[in-house]
Every structure is written in structure tokens, then in C-alpha cells.
Amino acid sequence: MASAIFVLNLKGKVIISRDYRADIPMSVVEKFLPLKSEVEEEQGFSTPCLTHEGINYIYIHHNDVYLLALSKMNSDAMEMLVFLRKMADVFIDYFKELQEESIRDNFVLVYELLDEIMDFGFPQTTETKILQEYITQTSNTVKKHAPPPIAMTNAISWRSEGIHYRKNEVFLDVIESVNLIAAADGTVIQSEILGKVRLKCYLSGMPELRLGLNDKVLFEAAGRTIKGNTVEMEDVKFHQCVRLARFENDRTISFIPPDGEFDLMSYRMSSNVRPLIWVECESIVHSGSRIEFMVKAKAQFKKRCIANNVQIIIPVPEDADSPRFQTSNGHVQYAPEQAAMVWNIKKFAGGKEFFMRAEMGLPSVKNEDIQVQKKRPVQLKFAIPYFTTSGIQVRYLKITEPKLNYHAMPWVRYVTQNGTEYSIRQ
Amino acid sequence: MVPKLFQSSRFKAFKKSETSELQKGLVSQYAYERIDAVKRTIAAMTVGKDVSSLFPDVLKNLATRDITLKKLVYLYLINYAKTHPDLCILAVNTFVKDSEEYNPTLRALAIRTMGCIRVNKIIGYLADPLRKALKDEHPYVRKAAAVCVVKMYDLDREYCASNGFIEQLQALVSDPNPVVVANAVRSLAEIHDQDPEKGYFNVVYTMTDRLMVALSECNEWGRITILNSLARFRTSDIKEAEYVCERVVPQFQHANSGVVLSAVKVIMVHIPLFSSDFTDFLYKKMAPPLLTLLSTDSEIQYVALRNINLILQKRPSIFDVKTRVFFCKYNDPLYIKMEKLKIITMLACDENINETISELRAYVSEVELEFVKQTIKCLGDVALKVPSVINDCISIFLEIYELNISYMVQEVTVVMETVLRKYPQKIDLLLPYLSRVIEELGDPRARSSMAWILGEFSHVIPTSSKLLSEMISTMADEDLQIQLALLTAVVKLSLMNGKGNDEELVQKVLNYAINQSSNQDLRDRAFAYQRLLTPENVRKAQKIVCCEKPSVSYNNNLPEALLDALLCEITTLASVYHKLPESFIGQGKFGADAIQRRAVEELNIEEANVHEAIEKGANVENLLDLDFTDPGATSASDSPITSAQPQSGSNSAMDLFMAFEAPSTNNAEPVKARSATDDLLGL
């Protein structure tokens, strides 16, 4: 629970605030940044929850603003931080971008939202689609009678009644993000797959959906075998529309979806993943005045798949200059601000191998401890369509709407991409 | 107090021309112009301009039937409700009227906003509409009313309790609508906690059924609330507890991390009751969702890691030996990396030690200074915990000595002291590096560790007396910590080597400590040693000083009682700080009261300023033009209800409060876990 919510800019100036409980002096917000830097000074880093003189500061950072909740009680820290994140999401949905300027341009709307998403410091609702039904940007359209959407307080709090589409369709995207840390010798130190099933629902009425996956637990429980592989998900998370008790009982994923786009479920597997794209990087320092890099990149996934927009970010010494690049494919850019060179490859087919050679000058005044050079990993970005690392498959998506009885088509796509961390240590 | 500068900018006078322009807009005959004007007024208010002189004009728009306009005026009111509630009383009749509206949005809005006006006088007006709203046919209104009860309770406990509002709120717990139930239990829980003896909200088994139904129908925030209420449920009946836990388990699959962790909380509260089979089952269910929290936003990860740390202390085997998931990512923020290091240390055991060590070795060459330091400390802890790995650790430390980067060398030296206490025979490996390392040490911790090493192993280190005499030459400039360590070190040196070779050195140090130093501790200790070192006592001295040291072992766990208390506080700030709530939310009522007083005081100052502004403003007569029937409510210069505390009094209260700063409940570091005599002599 929060006593007050603030939006601050990076200098600590309050852009907008809402005092929900009037039980703490609002001026304590001025302590926030000094307190944060004091903690940073003391222990070298700051944490998302700080306490000072009986006031707790709970905050997140997004673009050029801080979202800060103050409380003088032993509040639920997890709830507050998740709430602040969701609040940021609501602002992004409304203003496209959350930054100082977008808040300043929309004071009134922000106040209105702050009034609705939280009451007396208790989070109420953060479902943008429902909020948008009665807190609107088109301020001049005067609605005479706008009752609160029934969904606000309903058991189905994410979908309104009376939705109609001429053509009923569902688009299903299975997106797998691969996190991987590998050592230079090729051993995988850590790897995990974070999968997500994203739905775009254009369906009329109150449709009832059932999703079938090649879930190992489901098939083992039923004692059945199917053609092809099954996958074992270590943990699954569902959008609030999914009936959790039913899933716990018989692994059935059944739900009434929200309208439009949403993430239906996410799953995690920490099974050992072979690196999809492998990069070897060798560097030689020539007579102390120049450094030469030989880089080899290899696509180790299925031959018929193609990785798009591959980016290989290779760290170089911070004081290197005058780069020269030679490559069999793609093009290389020097990015001095991150002390790295970035090798871009538009299309990288499975089984292919590409090479790159780079040469850079080193300053004549030599850094004493060159061997002490801090090691930074090679990082990768990519997307491989029509491919999942885990082998997960959508077997069916059954759509029934008892009243309207229409026929709807589901469309399925798959893609694998890099996660927040896909790096090869040097 | 509000600094001068802040005040002046906040109450910057609003330009006359702008004011009159807005004023014109506010009384325009066209709705859209009025809406626009209110909007601009609110925008001006937000950027810190004082628009309180427009109050009467804004208020005129309240009687509108246009919901958009009404909402805007309410927003304006909420903002001023804080600074001058008595002005808001002017609007009270409209509120009462709105609470009878046909449109539920309006009814709810009126109840919600009225609750935000923090002045006792409002209660009289609020009572009837609130009573009706609690029985309203529309759940949206009931949900707002449920929260409004706690708002009223905050204003006037007596009134709220004696007029049946709490009973009405209790009835809402069995409301058919899940969101209403959630708000009702949340309000009740808070009212209960302010006065636990009254027992307003005791979760009993019969209530859990209703809560379970609401749980599966509620939105994410409602679920968190209901789970937190279920965590308040206490029973000694295993069947009941099992039933609750079983029905909470499906919530582990919810996408909202708050729901997941709250579900964990319910389980952790009840888990001590269960048989080992059911306990195993629950922990097994809990482990994957806890690990999934590590792939969320960093801040959420942080809370998860702090809680995992607690659960891991209770149940070290919960993740088997899976250390890998806790390995640091290059892009992790520092605060995450530090938490992960702690957990890696906790998980270290013979089964995973190889990958742990090779991972830690990789971290040593990372960029962030604090991270590298913590890694070195972590390596030392692992060496204490898993004896089989000591040689690997020492070889990493020696590699760092080879590299000779001063901050790393210093950290290693500090850790070395601890490691050598457990594995004294490893000193041989260190010998070649000592004289070079000593030059790199600037940090007092590292220097005193070095002094300890030189003293303790003076019989093995051939150059010990030379190195110590070098350190002693600058003794007068050193920190106390180092001086004490040096004193003990030379005494050990002389006693171990005997023969009186180092007599001169000892005398020099004793002489400095007794005659020159102004520090009592140092002097007293020097006197003690001096007496010990007399020829007739030498044997006893040897026995005392060169005795067998109690061994150190790795134990970073919290005390049992504290841990158990914190496990009932999962997801809260207490679980993040690893401190009991009492230690940081101000010493009981006293601290909280002081804060409240300061809040009130600040309001009063702002209010006084605003009053001044209004009185100066040209609009004062307009106030009287308003058609309000309640004569008592129109006086704009009513004195604030809550009288200001004398400033000095409140300040001293704050000072006192600060003096009560939370005592650190953190456990003593392993190094410090020495015996009492040991401490006394600084051995």
C-alpha cells in the first residue's frame, strides 16, 4: 500500500504527484535523490527499496522519470513494485511513451488515471483496455451517461460485453527468447528459454477458448503418445483470464480472452540449449601499436531456417582508433560509445559460416596493465522465424461462442530470438 | 520543514491576466470552454502555480450534469482537499446530491472524493451517503464505499466504530462480487491492525471458503489482497491448513509476480504444521515459480531474491543443487549481482563446487569494483564452507596477488585472514608474496589483517620482524584498528620467537601506546601486555597469547527466531530489508505519530499561505454569492481543525525519533565470531 505516488524527473523534481492518505509530509520526497546517492556512495549501489526516518521509498526507473511510491508502513514491496511497473505500462498504452514530456502534456489524464488505478493507496485496476472505455483522451466528446464498465467489478474483469467483428480471427505468436551465457571454449554456463504465447484476438461476443500444446505432463498424465516430440515446461505463468484451478487439475488451458493483443502465457525451460549462433573471436596485438581481430560466426540451427537482423557486438579496447574492417557478409560499424564493433548480418542461413577481420590502431602511450584489460563478453542479437528452440507446438485452438456460434480461424506463427542476455565470454 | 525556495516557487503568484482569462473561461456559457478552462487550471496547479483564488469559480461548475466536467472539478477539489479542506466543505452539498445520482459512476466518484477530504467536519455529511453506498446495488459503488470506511476510520475512529460502519464493512466480506470482497477485506485488515484488540478482522476457517471463491474470480490486485488475508489465517488444525494451502497452489501460475509471492507467503505461514510429505510437495511446487521470478524486471527480481534468501535459510535443499540459475548476467544491475552472489554462497556444496568456483573466477575479472570485491569475499566464504575447495580458492587469490591491482589485493588480504584461521597450514603458499603485497595496502581493514597475519605466523614468516618494523614505523599515523592489531602482532612475535631479539620492537610499540597515544583502549591493552610480558609471567603469557584459536566456520544465516518472524512477512518491506517491521517503521506509535504530526504541520503552513492568498484575492466576495444553504460551511477563514504543534516541540520529537534508528539485526560476520578473551586482546 502506498501513501503517495510521485512521478519525478531525473533531477528529483516532482512532475506530478498524488497524495492518497495524507499521513506523511509530502516534502519528504525531496529526500529521495539525496538518500539514493548517499546509499550509492556508502555501498556502491542503490536498491529499489530504501528506508529513512520511518519513510519507505519504493521506486522504479523508466526513461527519464522515476515512479516513486512512499509509505510509512510495512507495505507489500512486491505488490508496490509490480504496481509501479503496471502503472508505467498504463501510461505507455495511453501516451505511447512514458517520459517527462508525455506526463507534462497530459496532466489531466494522468490525474484521472491516478484516481482510478489506486484508492487510498490500494491498487484497484491496471487493465488499460477497460480503463480506456471510460477514461478517454478525446476530452471534448461529452458523454452524458457513462456507467462504469461492468468489467470493472466483474469476475471477468478484462473483457467487455457486446464486442463485434465481421470477421472472427485469432493470431497466435509463439515467441521464444533464449538467454545464454557461454565460455570462450564453447561450454554453456547458463541457458534458459523464456517462451511467450501472444494472442491477437478479434472475436465477437464472449468466446470460450481452449489451447492445446504438446505438453509432456499432459500427455503423460493421459497415458497417450503423439507423433513428434513433447516439451517439458519447468514453469508456466498465465494471464489472469486463464482458469488456474482447471490447469492445476488437468492441465487444460481454457479462458475467455481479452479483446485485442495480450500475452496469454509464458513458460520457462532451463534445459541445456546449444548456442544457436556461435562466435569465435581471436585478437592479436601487433608490436603494441595495432590490434587485429579474427572473428568467425557460425549458425548452428536447422538448415532451412534463416536468422534475420543478426547483430554481433564485439568489445574492443577503449582507446583503440582508426578501425578497418573486412568481411565476407554484412557490414561492420565501429561504436566507440560502447567500445565495441557491431557486425550486422541481414540474413544468416542455418549451417552457414561467416568471417570478419578487423584492425585497429592502439595509442602509442601504452596502458601499463594491458593484460588486466577487463573482459567484456561478445553479445548477440537475432531473430529466427518459423523456429522454436524448445520444439513447442500449438496443436489446436478451439473457439466456441455459445450464443453466436460463428466459425473463427486461428493463425499460428513461431519465432526464436535473443533474450536479455546472449553472450559469449572472452 | 519545507525549504524557503521550494515554497516560493510553489506559490508563485499567478499572472493577473492569466487568472482573469481562466476566470472568464470558467463561467463561460459553453461547456467545452468551461472544460478547457478547468483543465488549464489543473495544469497550472500541477506546475506549482497558485490557482486557489479561482476556487469559487471552479466550484460553480460542480453542479453540472456533464460527467467529464464534474470529474475535472473533483480532481481540482482532491488536490485542494489536502491544503484547505474547509473550502471543500463548500462543495459538500453537491457531493451529497451526487451520491443519489442515477449513474453509478457518479455515485462512486462522490463517495470516493468525499473520503479524500481530510477534515472531521465532513463526517457528518458523509455518514448517510456512505451508509447507503455500502448497500448500493452497483458493485462499483460498493467497492468505493468499502475503502471509504477506512478513510472515515482514519478521521474519527470513535464515530466510525460506534455507528455501525465496521459491521457493515464486515458484512461485505460475503458480498457476491469478488472485487468488493477484496476491498472490504483490505480495509478491514487495516482497521484491525490499528487496534488489534478490538478484533475487527479475525480470519476464521468458515470465512476462507468465501475468500477462496473470490480469489479465483478476482483481478490480480484483488488476488494479492485476498492471499494476504489468507496469510492472516491461523489454525492449529492441520486439515484446515492443508485445505487452504492446496487451494492456493494454483495461484503460482499467475502472471503477476505479486500474486505468486503472496501465494508463497500463505504457504510459508502454514508450512511448519505439515508432515514432511506434504511439506516436500509444497516446496517442490514452489521452487519453479520462485525461479521464474528471476526472469522479470530487475526491481521485482530484487524482491524475489531477498525472499528466496529467506526461504533458502529455512529450506536449504529447495532448489536441489541448482546454482546455475543464480549465475550473474553481464547486464544485471549491480544490486541484483550482489544478491545473487549471496545466494551462490549459500548454495555452495560439494556437488556444485566446481562450477561455482569457475564461475566466481570469471567474475573476478569483471568491470564493477564492488562486484569484484564481493566476489572475493564470496570465494573466502565458499572456502570456509566447502573445505575440499581450499586449494582452488588459494590459487585464485594468488593469481590476484600476481596481477597486483591494489583494491583486489587488499580485499584478498582481508579474506585471507579468515581463511588462514581455518587453514593455517596454507601460509606457506603465501610467503613469496608478502613483502610485495604489503606495499599495496592502503585500506585500514587490509592493513590490520596483514598485521594479524604477520603476528600469528611470525614463526613461519622469516621476514616477519622486518615487515612488522616497517609497518610500525608509521604507527602514529594509522587508524586505531591497525594500531591495536600491530600491538598484538609484535607481542606474538616476541613470545613466539623468544630469545628477546624483538625486544626493542615491542618496547617501541608499548612505549608509543602507553606514553604517546591518547586512546584508552590502546593504552589499556598495552598495559595488560606489559604486565604479561614480565619475565616471571612469560610462560603464562605464551599460554594466553599463543593459544589455540577457536575455529571459524561459515554461517551467515539469521537467528532462528528472526528468520521465522520474517518468513511470515514474505513480500513485505520487512522481507526485503531482513529486519522486523518495528525496526524501520518508527518505534511503535511514537515514530508514526511524529511523522503524522509533521504532515499535519506542513499542511497547516501551506494552508495558511493559501488563506492569505485567498484573502488578498479579489474573489472573496464571490464566495458569498454562492448559493449554499449551510451557513456554517461558508466561512472560508475557519481555523484549521487540527491545530499545529509548537514547532520546537515537534522538532525535538523528530530528533528523538531519529535517535531510535533501527538497530542492525544483521548477523555478525564470521570473522568477528571469536571468543570473548580473543576479542579483548585482539587476537
From Swiss-Prot, chain A:
Topology in membrane: Peripheral membrane protein
One GO cellular component, as annotated: Golgi apparatus
One record GO biological process: retrograde transport, endosome to Golgi
InterPro entries: Adaptor_comp_med_subunit (IPR050431), AP2_Mu_C_sf (IPR036168), AP_mu_sigma_su (IPR022775), Clathrin_mu (IPR001392), Clathrin_mu_CS (IPR018240), Longin-like_dom_sf (IPR011012), MHD (IPR028565)
Domain MHD residues, every copy: 167-425
CDD domains (alphabetical): AP-1_Mu1_Cterm, AP1_Mu_N
UniProt entry keywords in alphabetical sequence: Coated pit, Cytoplasmic vesicle, Membrane, Protein transport, Transport
Entry's localization field: Cytoplasmic vesicle, Clathrin-coated vesicle membrane; Membrane, Clathrin-coated pit
Annotated disulfide bonds: none
Matches recorded under Pfam families: Adap_comp_sub (PF00928), Clat_adaptor_s (PF01217)
Any one GO MF annotation of this record: clathrin adaptor activity
Similarity section: Belongs to the adaptor complexes medium subunit family.
Role, per record: Component of the adaptor complexes which link clathrin to receptors in coated vesicles. Clathrin-associated protein complexes are believed to interact with the cytoplasmic tails of membrane proteins, leading to their selection and concentration.
Assembly behavior: Adaptor protein complex 1 (AP-1) is a heterotetramer composed of two large adaptins (gamma-type subunit apl4 and beta-type subunit apl2), a medium adaptin (mu-type subunit apm1) and a small adaptin (sigma-type subunit aps1). AP-1 interacts with clathrin. Interacts with sad1.
Protein name: AP-1 complex subunit mu-1
Species assigned in the record: Schizosaccharomyces pombe (strain 972 / ATCC 24843)
Gene encoding the protein: apm1
Swiss-Prot record, chain B:
Quaternary context: Adaptor protein complex 1 (AP-1) is a heterotetramer composed of two large adaptins (gamma-type subunit apl4 and beta-type subunit apl2), a medium adaptin (mu-type subunit apm1) and a small adaptin (sigma-type subunit aps1). AP-1 interacts with clathrin.
A Pfam family it matches: Adaptin_N
Function: Adaptins are components of the adaptor complexes which link clathrin to receptors in coated vesicles. Clathrin-associated protein complexes are believed to interact with the cytoplasmic tails of membrane proteins, leading to their selection and concentration. The AP-1 complex interacts directly with clathrin.
Phosphoserine: residues bearing it: S675
Source domain of life: Eukaryota
Keywords, sorted A to Z: Cell membrane, Coated pit, Membrane, Phosphoprotein, Protein transport, Transport
Residue ranges with Polar residues bias: 632-649
InterPro entries: AP_beta (IPR026739), AP_complex_bsu_1_2_4 (IPR016342), ARM-like (IPR011989), ARM-type_fold (IPR016024), Clathrin/coatomer_adapt-like_N (IPR002553)
Entry's Gene Ontology molecular function annotations: clathrin binding
Membrane topology, as annotated: Peripheral membrane protein
Compartments in which it is found: Cell membrane; Membrane, Coated pit
Protein name: AP-1 complex subunit beta-1
Source species: Schizosaccharomyces pombe (strain 972 / ATCC 24843)
Annotated stretches, region: Disordered: 629-649
Similarity-based family: Belongs to the adaptor complexes large subunit family.
Gene Ontology process terms (BP): endosome to plasma membrane protein transport; retrograde transport, endosome to Golgi
Cellular component GO terms held in the UniProt record: AP-1 adaptor complex; clathrin-coated pit; cytosol; endosome; Golgi apparatus; plasma membrane
